[in-house]
Design a protein with these regions (language model features):
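Short, conserved, surface-exposed binding loops centered on an aromatic residue
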Residues: 66-70, 96-98, 120-124, 152
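Alpha-helical, coiled-coil/dimerization segments enriched in small aliphatic residues
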Residues: 86-114, 118
Protein backbone atom coordinates (compact mmCIF):
# COMPACT_ATOMS: atom_id res chain seq x y z
CA UNK A 1 0.00 0.00 0.00
CA UNK A 2 1.34 3.44 -0.93
CA UNK A 3 0.33 6.37 1.27
CA UNK A 4 1.36 10.02 1.47
CA UNK A 5 3.81 10.75 4.28
CA UNK A 6 1.29 13.09 5.91
CA UNK A 7 -0.74 9.96 6.81
CA UNK A 8 2.19 8.35 8.60
CA UNK A 9 0.22 8.08 11.86
CA UNK A 10 -2.07 5.52 10.21
CA UNK A 11 0.79 3.29 9.04
CA UNK A 12 1.12 1.18 12.24
CA UNK A 13 -2.57 0.29 12.07
CA UNK A 14 -2.23 -0.80 8.44
CA UNK A 15 0.87 -2.85 9.25
CA UNK A 16 -1.05 -4.57 12.05
CA UNK A 17 -3.48 -5.68 9.35
CA UNK A 18 -0.60 -7.40 7.57
CA UNK A 19 -0.13 -4.75 4.91
CA UNK A 20 3.25 -3.62 3.61
CA UNK A 21 3.16 0.17 3.57
CA UNK A 22 5.35 2.61 1.66
CA UNK A 23 5.13 6.30 2.59
CA UNK A 24 6.04 8.88 -0.04
CA UNK A 25 6.24 12.67 -0.08
CA UNK A 26 6.52 13.73 -3.74
CA UNK A 27 5.77 17.42 -3.18
CA UNK A 28 8.74 18.68 -5.22
CA UNK A 29 10.88 17.29 -8.05
CA UNK A 30 13.40 15.64 -5.72
CA UNK A 31 10.57 14.13 -3.69
CA UNK A 32 8.93 12.75 -6.82
CA UNK A 33 12.18 11.14 -7.92
CA UNK A 34 12.59 9.72 -4.41
CA UNK A 35 9.13 8.17 -4.64
CA UNK A 36 9.93 6.66 -8.05
CA UNK A 37 13.15 5.17 -6.67
CA UNK A 38 11.40 3.75 -3.60
CA UNK A 39 8.66 2.12 -5.66
CA UNK A 40 11.15 0.80 -8.20
CA UNK A 41 13.15 -0.85 -5.42
CA UNK A 42 10.02 -2.29 -3.83
CA UNK A 43 8.86 -3.79 -7.13
CA UNK A 44 12.30 -4.92 -8.28
CA UNK A 45 12.15 -2.61 -11.31
CA UNK A 46 15.12 -0.38 -10.49
CA UNK A 47 16.32 -0.15 -14.10
CA UNK A 48 12.90 0.96 -15.32
CA UNK A 49 12.74 3.51 -12.52
CA UNK A 50 16.09 4.93 -13.58
CA UNK A 51 14.95 5.11 -17.21
CA UNK A 52 11.82 6.96 -16.13
CA UNK A 53 13.81 9.48 -14.10
CA UNK A 54 16.19 10.06 -16.99
CA UNK A 55 13.28 10.67 -19.38
CA UNK A 56 11.66 13.16 -17.00
CA UNK A 57 15.01 14.87 -16.35
CA UNK A 58 15.69 15.16 -20.07
CA UNK A 59 12.31 16.74 -20.77
CA UNK A 60 12.62 19.21 -17.90
CA UNK A 61 16.16 20.17 -18.95
CA UNK A 62 14.94 20.86 -22.48
CA UNK A 63 12.06 22.90 -21.07
CA UNK A 64 14.40 24.93 -18.86
CA UNK A 65 16.54 25.71 -21.89
CA UNK A 66 13.48 26.72 -23.92
CA UNK A 67 12.21 29.24 -21.35
CA UNK A 68 15.60 30.54 -20.21
CA UNK A 69 15.77 34.32 -20.25
CA UNK A 70 12.00 34.85 -20.35
CA UNK A 71 10.12 36.88 -17.76
CA UNK A 72 8.36 34.84 -15.07
CA UNK A 73 4.69 35.90 -14.91
CA UNK A 74 2.68 35.39 -11.74
CA UNK A 75 0.44 32.33 -11.72
CA UNK A 76 -2.51 31.54 -9.47
CA UNK A 77 -3.18 27.80 -9.57
CA UNK A 78 -6.77 27.19 -8.53
CA UNK A 79 -7.83 23.94 -6.87
CA UNK A 80 -10.26 21.18 -7.81
CA UNK A 81 -13.27 22.29 -5.77
CA UNK A 82 -13.17 26.06 -6.09
CA UNK A 83 -11.27 28.97 -7.56
CA UNK A 84 -10.87 30.07 -3.94
CA UNK A 85 -8.47 27.17 -3.27
CA UNK A 86 -4.82 27.41 -4.23
CA UNK A 87 -1.49 25.63 -3.92
CA UNK A 88 1.30 27.19 -1.89
CA UNK A 89 5.05 26.51 -2.06
CA UNK A 90 4.79 23.28 -0.04
CA UNK A 91 2.86 21.54 -2.82
CA UNK A 92 4.11 19.94 -6.03
CA UNK A 93 2.08 22.39 -8.10
CA UNK A 94 4.55 25.10 -7.02
CA UNK A 95 7.39 23.07 -8.59
CA UNK A 96 5.36 22.76 -11.77
CA UNK A 97 4.95 26.55 -11.94
CA UNK A 98 8.67 27.05 -11.38
CA UNK A 99 9.53 24.44 -14.04
CA UNK A 100 7.47 26.50 -16.49
CA UNK A 101 9.31 29.69 -15.45
CA UNK A 102 6.37 31.20 -13.65
CA UNK A 103 6.07 32.72 -10.18
CA UNK A 104 3.52 31.30 -7.76
CA UNK A 105 1.16 34.13 -6.79
CA UNK A 106 0.47 32.20 -3.56
CA UNK A 107 4.14 31.94 -2.57
CA UNK A 108 3.35 33.37 0.87
CA UNK A 109 0.81 30.63 1.71
CA UNK A 110 2.01 28.37 4.53
CA UNK A 111 -0.56 25.58 4.23
CA UNK A 112 0.81 22.20 3.21
CA UNK A 113 -2.39 21.31 1.36
CA UNK A 114 -4.88 23.28 -0.73
CA UNK A 115 -5.35 26.62 1.01
CA UNK A 116 -8.64 28.51 1.12
CA UNK A 117 -8.33 32.17 0.15
CA UNK A 118 -10.71 35.06 -0.46
CA UNK A 119 -11.55 37.00 -3.58
CA UNK A 120 -9.88 39.98 -1.95
CA UNK A 121 -6.66 38.02 -1.58
CA UNK A 122 -6.67 36.99 -5.23
CA UNK A 123 -7.25 40.60 -6.28
CA UNK A 124 -4.42 41.70 -4.01
CA UNK A 125 -2.07 39.16 -5.60
CA UNK A 126 -3.46 40.18 -9.02
CA UNK A 127 -1.94 37.26 -10.95
CA UNK A 128 -1.09 37.47 -14.63
CA UNK A 129 -2.57 34.01 -15.17
CA UNK A 130 -5.18 31.86 -13.44
CA UNK A 131 -4.69 28.15 -14.09
CA UNK A 132 -7.39 25.66 -13.12
CA UNK A 133 -6.41 22.25 -11.77
CA UNK A 134 -6.82 19.30 -14.13
CA UNK A 135 -9.80 17.91 -12.21
CA UNK A 136 -11.50 21.24 -11.45
CA UNK A 137 -15.24 20.92 -10.84
CA UNK A 138 -15.82 24.29 -12.56
CA UNK A 139 -14.62 25.66 -15.88
CA UNK A 140 -12.72 28.52 -17.47
CA UNK A 141 -15.88 30.41 -18.45
CA UNK A 142 -17.14 30.42 -14.86
CA UNK A 143 -13.93 32.17 -13.79
CA UNK A 144 -13.96 34.62 -16.70
CA UNK A 145 -17.59 35.49 -15.88
CA UNK A 146 -17.09 35.75 -12.12
CA UNK A 147 -17.91 39.38 -11.31
CA UNK A 148 -15.80 39.20 -8.15
CA UNK A 149 -12.70 38.65 -10.31
CA UNK A 150 -13.49 41.21 -13.00
CA UNK A 151 -10.64 43.50 -11.91
CA UNK A 152 -8.02 40.73 -11.86
CA UNK A 153 -5.38 41.08 -14.58
CA UNK A 154 -5.67 37.41 -15.55
CA UNK A 155 -9.41 37.80 -16.14
CA UNK A 156 -9.16 41.14 -17.93
CA UNK A 157 -6.52 39.70 -20.26
CA UNK A 158 -8.48 36.42 -20.57
CA UNK A 159 -5.44 34.55 -19.32
CA UNK A 160 -7.46 31.76 -17.69
CA UNK A 161 -6.73 28.15 -18.65
CA UNK A 162 -7.28 24.62 -17.37
CA UNK A 163 -4.56 22.00 -17.22
CA UNK A 164 -5.13 18.91 -19.41
CA UNK A 165 -6.94 15.93 -17.91
CA UNK A 166 -7.45 13.52 -20.81
CA UNK A 167 -5.48 10.67 -19.20
CA UNK A 168 -4.58 11.73 -15.66
CA UNK A 169 -4.20 14.88 -13.58
CA UNK A 170 -0.86 16.22 -14.80
CA UNK A 171 -0.75 18.75 -11.96
CA UNK A 172 -0.46 15.93 -9.42
CA UNK A 173 2.92 14.55 -8.28
CA UNK A 174 2.97 11.67 -10.76
CA UNK A 175 5.60 10.74 -13.38
CA UNK A 176 3.56 12.38 -16.16
CA UNK A 177 3.50 15.67 -14.25
CA UNK A 178 6.37 16.99 -16.36
CA UNK A 179 3.70 17.35 -19.06
CA UNK A 180 1.89 19.74 -16.74
CA UNK A 181 5.03 21.86 -16.62
CA UNK A 182 5.35 21.77 -20.42
CA UNK A 183 1.68 22.66 -20.94
CA UNK A 184 1.91 25.51 -18.45
CA UNK A 185 5.05 26.80 -20.16
CA UNK A 186 3.18 26.73 -23.49
CA UNK A 187 0.58 29.02 -21.92
CA UNK A 188 3.06 31.37 -20.23
CA UNK A 189 5.66 31.40 -23.02
CA UNK A 190 3.89 30.44 -26.27
CA UNK A 191 6.68 31.74 -28.50
CA UNK A 192 9.29 29.55 -26.81
CA UNK A 193 7.09 26.53 -26.05
CA UNK A 194 4.66 26.04 -28.90
CA UNK A 195 1.63 23.77 -29.03
CA UNK A 196 3.67 21.50 -31.30
CA UNK A 197 6.41 21.36 -28.64
CA UNK A 198 3.84 20.26 -26.06
CA UNK A 199 2.35 17.56 -28.29
CA UNK A 200 5.83 16.27 -29.14
CA UNK A 201 6.63 15.96 -25.41
CA UNK A 202 3.32 14.20 -24.77
Amino acid sequence: VIVPAKLKDSIPQMEEMGLTVLAVKPENQAGLFGAIELLAQATNTTARGEELEMAIDSNLAALAEAVAGTDAPSVYLAGNSSVLETAGPAMYQNTMIENANGTNAAASVEDTYWAEVSYEQILDWNPDYIILASDAEYDVDSVLNDAALADCTAVKERHVYQLPHAVEAVDSPVPASFLGSVYLASVLHPEQVTEEYYHAAA
